[in-house]
UniProtKB/Swiss-Prot annotation:
GO cellular component term of the entry, any: DNA polymerase III complex
Descriptive protein name: Beta sliding clamp
Subcellular location: Cytoplasm
Family per record: Belongs to the beta sliding clamp family.
CDD domains from the UniProt entry: beta_clamp (cd00140)
SUPFAM superfamilies reported for this sequence: DNA clamp
Entry keywords, A to Z: Cytoplasm, DNA replication, DNA-binding, DNA-directed DNA polymerase, Nucleotidyltransferase, Transferase
Pfam families listed in its UniProt record: DNA_pol3_beta, DNA_pol3_beta_2, DNA_pol3_beta_3
GO biological process, one term: DNA strand elongation involved in DNA replication
Organism for this UniProt entry: Micrococcus luteus (Micrococcus lysodeikticus)
Role noted for this protein: Confers DNA tethering and processivity to DNA polymerases and other proteins. Acts as a clamp, forming a ring around DNA (a reaction catalyzed by the clamp-loading complex) which diffuses in an ATP-independent manner freely and bidirectionally along dsDNA. Initially characterized for its ability to contact the catalytic subunit of DNA polymerase III (Pol III), a complex, multichain enzyme responsible for most of the replicative synthesis in bacteria; Pol III exhibits 3'-5' exonuclease proofreading activity.
Length: 310
């Protein structure tokens, strides 16, 4: 195998694929990136039994072939290279990476030991990447970080026709966000449980590339996302998610409009005196909301932020 490609193109591709690598892979080969060179195209893939990532880049392929090398080491190497063309070549049991006068030699891992990548599910529709990323950012903050309750580390994604609803809770907070999308089947009706960290990673790495394609399999254990030639899959979380939609009121008799940045900053300051897992109180009156924390002889704090009651 031997191919040549611009440094920035290779760096971007390797960096994206390496983001899916587990810091503690269950088997050594899963720390590697699978690189396949064919006529004019190089594909790079990673897999950890839960998530997979794959993409293709154009390259000058002199000799076709396939190798498996340490993803994190290759990522560190290509990021350090100067702005010039990079040649990647298999030489015996080593992979040589050459850029101008820089030359690196990497050990390979047995390609035959690498598990087969999951088949990509069929395209189910497209959604605006920016809207998807914004919704994910708003909802995942309410997902649990406690792995002893894996069901709550997931976000429930409900799809009904042209509407996608994201729901999350950690038992203390609730979050829900609806966005529109363009389904291939207008009558689609399904729900998925996707790990919050998976959605966050998809939003970061694929949400800025225009339209985001959502891929749904025939079985209920895999979901995929694709944008700009990059494709990723994730195993779904199994279990019964709490029925939290009904906890959101149909309407609210009173609404308060407040500057987001001012409320966040005030909350951070007042929370400095709050003990762990204690409440920060919010009192709404005409023209302001007062934040209060701490009681008795302990430290206390309060701050008011302008607001409009509707």
């Amino acid at each position: 195998m031997k191919f040549t490609v611009e440094r920035d193109i290779l760096t971007d591709a390797v960096s994206w694929a390496a983001r899916s690598l587990s810091p503690r892979p269950p088997v050594p080969v899963l720390s590697g990136l699978l690189i396949t060179a064919e006529a004019g195209v190089v594909s790079i893939a990673s897999f950890d039994y839960e998530t997979s990532a794959r993409l293709e880049i154009e390259a000058d392929v002199e000799t076709a072939g396939q190798v498996l090398v340490s993803g994190r080491l290759l990522n560190d190497i290509v990021r350090s290279l100067p702005q010039a063309q990079v040649t990647v070549e298999l030489d015996g049991g080593k992979v040589l990476v050459t850029c101008r006068s820089s030359r690196f030699s990497l050990a390979t891992m047995p390609v035959g030991d690498y598990p087969a990548l999951p088949e990509l599910p069929a395209p189910a529709g497209t959604v605006d990447g920016a809207a998807f990323a914004h919704a994910v950012a708003q909802v995942t903050v309410a997902a649990s970080k406690d792995d002893t309750l894996p069901i709550l580390t997931a976000v429930k994604v409900e799809i009904e026709g042209d509407t996608i609803t994201f729901l999350a809770t950690d038992r203390y907070r609730l979050a829900m966000k609806e966005i529109r999308w363009t389904p291939a089947d207008p009558s689609i009706s399904t729900s998925l449980l996707i790990k919050a960290r998976t959605l966050t990673e998809v939003a970061k790495s694929l949400g800025s590339g225009g339209d985001l394609e959502i891929l749904l399999g025939q079985t209920a254990d895999l979901v995929g996302f694709a944008s700009g030639g990059r494709r990723t899959t994730s195993v779904l979380v199994d279990g019964e998610y709490p029925k939290i939609r009904s906890l959101f009121p149909e309407s609210s008799p009173i609404q308060a409009v407040v500057d987001t940045a001012a409320l966040v900053e005030a909350s951070r300051r007042v929370a400095l005196v709050a003990e762990r897992n204690t409440a920060l109180r919010m009192v709404f009156t005409e023209g302001q909301v007062t934040l209060d924390a701490g009681t008795g002889d302990d430290a206390s704090a309060n701050e008011s932020v302008p607001c409009t009651l509707e």
